[in-house]
Design a protein with these regions (language model features):
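Divalent metal-cofactor coordination and adjacent catalytic microenvironments
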Residues: 2-157
Length: 157
């Protein structure tokens, strides 16, 4: 993973196996199941597919960490609560005299996430996550063909 396909984000083999399985499922989806029965015979195509799995695995691992960090930050940060005691916002400032509390707006929260990285901004947003993963895989899979000569990313019949 790290030496042959230059993966770098996943610290252990158990975590890699989990993310690689999820990445393979994602590649099966975007290649319209063309890889379910195995890789193409062409060795260069096989290498590109394996690199795509590793790159998507890295992104999936980063997304998982970002979501865990967001949940942890939300649980540990000050937030406003509604009538039922459920959290409904993040407190960004608080004054004591004559009590004044300011809450982060959704756009402020989103802008902060976008500033971190594409992975953090995609975390929790299914459409952004899918685009990030597709763009990551596309770099490796563009032009790669199956044994019948059909491009893996071709959506036609």
């Amino acid at each position: 993973y790290t030496t042959k396909y230059y993966g770098s984000d996943i610290p252990d083999s158990q975590s890699f196996d989990k993310q690689a399985e999820r990445a393979s499922d994602f590649l099966d989806t975007i290649t319209f199941e063309r890889l379910v029965d195995g890789l193409p015979d062409n060795e260069r195509a096989q290498t590109k597919i394996k690199k795509a799995v590793c790159a998507v695995s890295d992104k999936l691992y980063g997304l998982e960490l970002a979501e865990k960090q967001a949940l942890s930050a939300a649980a540990g940060s000050d937030s406003k609560t509604d009538i039922n005691g459920k959290s409904s916002g993040i407190i960004v400032s608080r004054n004591s005299g004559s009590e004044s509390i300011s809450y982060a707006s959704p756009s402020e929260i989103a802008n902060g996430a976008k500033a971190w990285s594409a992975v953090y901004s995609a975390a929790g947003d299914e459409q952004a996550t899918n685009k990030l993963l597709y763009d990551t895989a596309n770099v490796y899979l563009m032009g790669v063909r199956d044994n019948e000569g059909t491009p893996l990313l071709f959506a036609g019949l």
